[in-house]
């Protein structure tokens, strides 16, 4: 890892979403392993998630953090909230996120809350429908955040001004 990457890693917020114990049954008994799901973000629109597997919890968490740093996306925020309401799904997990006024806070549950906190979203109303499996909820949240575009990008694609797009 270069010095620049170490400095970037120091300012990232890290959150552990889930640790799961799994068992492999063999002739002599069970062999236990652990999986970890983590999210990292700079609190300013960059966010990533990762999964790690190992025989011990700390090693699994470290692997997940490393994977999350390699899997970062940039989210275009409108101040400290979302640009517009977003729906997304991954598997059977469906998420709905909508911008909220100043002072609302993050109204979201579990895995979704962790992603939105480290992404730097401070005011949002969010709901999860269908499956609440943390892995699928995190992936669905990422799909929604990835799909969100700034009004400037949409205006440029349509050949209109930002004022026409926003109404």
From Swiss-Prot:
UniProt keyword Ribonucleoprotein, yes or no: yes
Family, as annotated: Belongs to the universal ribosomal protein uS5 family.
Self-association state and partner proteins as the record states: Part of the 30S ribosomal subunit. Contacts proteins S4 and S8.
Function: With S4 and S12 plays an important role in translational accuracy. Located at the back of the 30S subunit body where it stabilizes the conformation of the head with respect to the body.
Keyword rRNA-binding attributed: yes
Alphabetized UniProt keyword annotations: Ribonucleoprotein, Ribosomal protein, RNA-binding, rRNA-binding
An annotated GO BP: translation
Domain S5 DRBM as annotated: residue spans: 12-75
GO molecular function annotation: rRNA binding; structural constituent of ribosome
Record's protein name: Small ribosomal subunit protein uS5
Signal sequence extent: none
Cellular component terms (Gene Ontology): small ribosomal subunit
UniProt cross-references to Gene3D superfamilies, sorted A to Z: 3.30.160.20, 3.30.230.10
Domain notes: The N-terminal domain interacts with the head of the 30S subunit; the C-terminal domain interacts with the body and contacts protein S4. The interaction surface between S4 and S5 is involved in control of translational fidelity.
